[in-house]
Amino acid sequence: IPKGLLAFIQQNVDEWKFDPVLAGGKAVGVRNKMSLRVVAKKLDDDEYSVRLQAASFDPLTVEPGHEVESKSMTPPRYPEAAGRSGVSGTVYVVIKVGRDGSVEDAVAEQVNLRMVASSLAMEQWRTVLGKAAVQQARKWQFIPPVAGELADDAYWSVRVPVDFMLSMTSPQYGEWQAYVPGPRQSYPWAEDE
């Protein structure tokens, strides 16, 4: 990772504030997995605009039975037309998981492409990838939580990234990846949450 980019990240991270994690009413130290998305946009031949797009923090471990777990998640088939045209991307599918672990509903919340084309072409490719991901997601099975604060919920929402990649190799840590974000759509049951 270039030194200038590391300095940019450090400068931003130094400004972050976190609420403490409490155990027995006292603040305790925790370790989490962290993911950071840095987006760079080329302005001219040697200048870029850089911003922190997203950060996520996930526990290193979760007590068994305290959250929704996957049971059967066969990946979707790569749409043939997309593969022939060199189209790749990530579909963020939001899934409504019922109490029996079946999928009650699924929506392509956002489709990000790894290629640039006309607005119309990108909209069409987002539809193709989104449809393939949602069709397969409706067949998936999950294991509902049986303990903890989520156990008695009527349903659970799960967000799953579905990658359509032509190459089986993912970018390594610190490598740039093309990213053309698509519009974010709400899902019908969001108002109930």
Regions found by a protein language model. Name each.
Residues I1-E193:
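Charge-biased low-complexity segments
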